[in-house]
Curated annotation (Swiss-Prot):
The keyword Nucleotidyltransferase does not apply. It holds the Pfam family TraC. Residues 60-98 are annotated as: Disordered. This is Conjugal transfer protein TraC.
Amino acid sequence: MKKPSSKIREEIARLQDQLKQAETREAERIGRIALKAGLGDIEIDEAELQAAFEDVAKRFRGGKGSATGKRQAGDSRTGSEPYATQPTGADAGGLSEA
């Protein structure tokens, strides 16, 4: 039996709300981590910061190359990609302020 279009619209609206809530939680989590790392005190262009975050994401996904600060068509995170285990602290070799 097929669902009526009104039920499908209700389900889509419910799922969009769930997606918005999940994205908000993720953004707040990343924001808290960025503030703890001191990024709130650094004067940096938004495009540069975007590129740095993309580099970090590639590092944890196991990719290589530098980011441009712009999203490519088809770039999306589904949550199904595995994360690579990376060292933390001084051995991480991540972003640092000179």
